[in-house]
From Swiss-Prot:
Galactokinase is a key enzyme in the galactose metabolism where it catalyzes the conversion of alpha-D-galactose to galactose 1-phosphate. Can also induce the transcription of the yeast GAL genes in response to the organism being challenged with galactose as the sole source of carbon. It's striking amino acid sequence similarity to GAL3 might explain its GAL3-like induction activity. The record marks R53 as: Transition state stabilizer. The active site is at D217. This is Galactokinase. GO terms for molecular function: ATP binding; galactokinase activity. ATP binds at G165, G167, S169, S170, S264, N265, K266.
Amino acid sequence: MTKSHSEEVIVPEFNSSAKELPRPLAEKCPSIIKKFISAYDAKPDFVARSPGRVNLIGEHIDYCDFSVLPLAIDFDMLCAVKVLNEKNPSITLINADPKFAQRKFDLPLDGSYVTIDPSVSDWSNYFKCGLHVAHSFLKKLAPERFASAPLAGLQVFCEGDVPTGSGLSSSAAFICAVALAVVKANMGPGYHMSKQNLMRITVVAEHYVGVNNGGMDQAASVCGEEDHALYVEFKPQLKATPFKFPQLKNHEISFVIANTLVVSNKFETAPTNYNLRVVEVTTAANVLAATYGVVLLSGKEGSSTNKGNLRDFMNVYYARYHNISTPWNGDIESGIERLTKMLVLVEESLANKKQGFSVDDVAQSLNCSREEFTRDYLTTSPVRFQVLKLYQRAKHVYSESLRVLKAVKLMTTASFTADEDFFKQFGALMNESQASCDKLYECSCPEIDKICSIALSNGSYGSRLTGAGWGGCTVHLVPGGPNGNIEKVKEALANEFYKVKYPKITDAELENAIIVSKPALGSCLYEL
């Protein structure tokens, strides 16, 4: 296994004397530096950059603490920064996109945090999220400097090409770039930020604008590497391990990312979609535990998962029946063995109610009253349902988690006599994932299904939804390079989906809706 991004792995830093710059810096730094000079009539000191991400495989399993396989993409957020030496420091923000107005705010002289008002929807709030977590980190890192004194004033020019609202984590990319920039600006050239620290501090950043997330977005943005996918683990701690894609003879490994342009309003649909799935997988874990006579350890307090989850069940089952007291540590081979066993148990104990469990059925399985089940499982977040589909949801979580491990194993141990062998085998896992998301987890939609069908008919080997589903983005494994299928897939999607469903779509909107990426470098710095 390649080395995970632990404390000693530093965020890459480059400067103008570097012989060769990474692809995104070489392409984008000259332009943002010119724009900064035009805006501020001065040169920036450095540029901080962090990319968006796409999840290749591992959907709706992170909140059960199972590992996922995202990669950083060629679309990113950049912040060009000049550090100011002011008695009354302030931060000025200019965005290359004119729809995001210029902002300026003072930094508290006593070293207190800049306030964030989550009730106001403004792009500067996301900057302030990155500022806040960086400030908190600096206070712990050098309390003598930052406990009761202000941060350095900054002039910042922001530019990004991660399509917003597309499920490619533009907000995480922006916040990671901001946090990196603020730490660099205040600690100076002698301090080098570790990837682990940047990932750790940014995971909680969006909580300040009322968004809860599990850490995959930040891990992928910070730790991405060219030609690698990231095996992101959530237990026992957040960790990202890069795995290199195989070197193919005649093709590049590329991904077409196509946005359905269907927006699922998370707040409105949560009672029948996201919130309900969390309740169903939590209930499934507890019904399995009751069936096999084991007790789940309490999970995260303050959420429906304080009842434990499907990974917790796997661990306590193996402790009881296989005398393995150590919880699964993310190892690929033992994970494959355990998840395969979990799928057997799901068939044994939940398949008799494929049509769904009523509240009375669940209460009987848990040996509690209707009222107790309702109180303990159904009151944390609003949900609406006729029956709880415990069999389908548990089967998806365990089979999807197994596919993640099989994908990593395929990348690291398999040998391919022809390029097509890799595309077929990896693509098959992606197609199985989509089928599971559609049939078992029911988080697809007609537009996702249509896009996947068109792509597979025109040269994609694996096509699936990515992100929460019910709309949003799709990802497609497509051979790249001179002999590849990229243009054929893009053209088919444009003609058979976008121009049919959205006849008034503009060229610019179409360009934003279908993007192509290879696995890209994560967060980095460029010093002038």
